């Protein structure tokens, strides 16, 4: 809800400022211009926010997810069978399940992988990070985090959640995994 209020306020204020600046030449009365600009900006912000809420909710319904705890930064912690090198290789393979993804930083000693996802109509690109930590010789913890590249993103229409779901499902098909910490409310698929 906080994201939607911020989105509403930002879009209202920006559009109000544009209306006020554009209307200053037409009207000599500053009070009329400010009231007109703020009113139109409020209506525009409300309209844009309602459209974004509708699109966002339709993506969630289509994915079969609820709205609780939804964020633009999504992560899940899983336990995978295999040694650290095998699990890192599996993580690199699962990158293909996300469109427009490119492998970025790979640090096998620290168990860090960074993936960059290209721009699409839902976001200005995403950054996916894998943190692989060996528990035993045959088990590893993997934390998968997906976030927008543009840090000021308020609404991503479920794109980063979709990234985490695709990667998790791909890992499930290739290895035996167990979900340890589900921060993005993914139901078992």
Describe every region a protein language model picked out.
Residues 2-5, 19-189:
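Ser/Thr-rich, low-complexity intrinsically disordered terminal regions
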Residues 1-14:
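N-terminal membrane-targeting/pre-transmembrane regions
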């Amino acid at each position: 809800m906080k994201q939607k209020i911020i989105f509403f306020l930002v879009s209202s204020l920006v559009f109000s400022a544009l209306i006020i600046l554009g209307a200053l030449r037409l009207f000599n009365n500053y009070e009329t211009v400010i009231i007109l600009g703020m009113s139109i900006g409020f209506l525009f912000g409300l309209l844009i926010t309602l459209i974004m809420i509708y699109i966002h909710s339709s993506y969630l319904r289509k994915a079969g997810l609820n709205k609780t705890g939804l964020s633009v930064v999504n992560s899940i912690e899983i336990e995978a069978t295999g040694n650290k090198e095998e699990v890192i290789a599996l993580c690199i393979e699962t990158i293909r399940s996300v469109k427009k993804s490119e492998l970025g930083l790979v640090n096998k000693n620290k168990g860090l992988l960074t993936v960059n996802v290209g721009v699409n109509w839902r976001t200005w690109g995403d950054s996916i990070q894998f943190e692989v930590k060996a528990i035993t010789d045959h088990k590893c913890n993997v934390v998968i985090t997906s976030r927008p590249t543009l840090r000021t993103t308020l609404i991503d229409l479920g794109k980063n959640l979709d990234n985490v779901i695709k990667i998790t499902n791909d890992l499930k098909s290739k290895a035996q995994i167990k979900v340890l910490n589900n921060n993005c409310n993914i139901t078992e698929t």
